[in-house]
Amino acid sequence: MPELPEVETSKRYIEKFLLNAKILNIQNSVSKLRWVIHPNIKFFFNNTIILKIDRIGKYILINTSNKNTLILHLGMSGYLSVNDANFKKEKHDHIIINFECITGEKKCLIFNDQRRFGYIDFHYTSNLKKHFLIKNLGIDGLSKSIKYEFLKKIFSKKTIIIKSVLL
């Protein structure tokens, strides 16, 4: 399973290509990964602009101009890649987001997930913290808000292995 630093690296990688790009369409070759893919996802983001790319925990969030956010989770074996529009599709390329860069160049964001434990969904950006997968997440492991005092408070009454507490 991609760990948090790998998800952050993926987020930074796609951000270089996707920021301010226009989504042309979204294609899915399967109807479900971990869960059923919403059937309207194919149409809902056509001709929207990508305003921001974020990450909460292991979820990559693609905020768009239609006030909705695409939510991606890489699952156990998933990864993202950016290719030219005329790329050769591989067997496990399950989600393809066709987009136009600000330079006018057409590219694709490919979500490849061999084991199909990944996830794609969308939710209102203003209400994102209430999404069923995001609402119970704790403080982000890479957050600058984690201070010594906070960790001291958490660990002061624990008598278990430190790795278990951190995870």
What would you call each of these model-derived segments?
Residues 70-167:
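Phosphate/anion-contacting hairpin/loop surfaces
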Residues 1-68, 88-89, 96-101:
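Extended, highly charged segments
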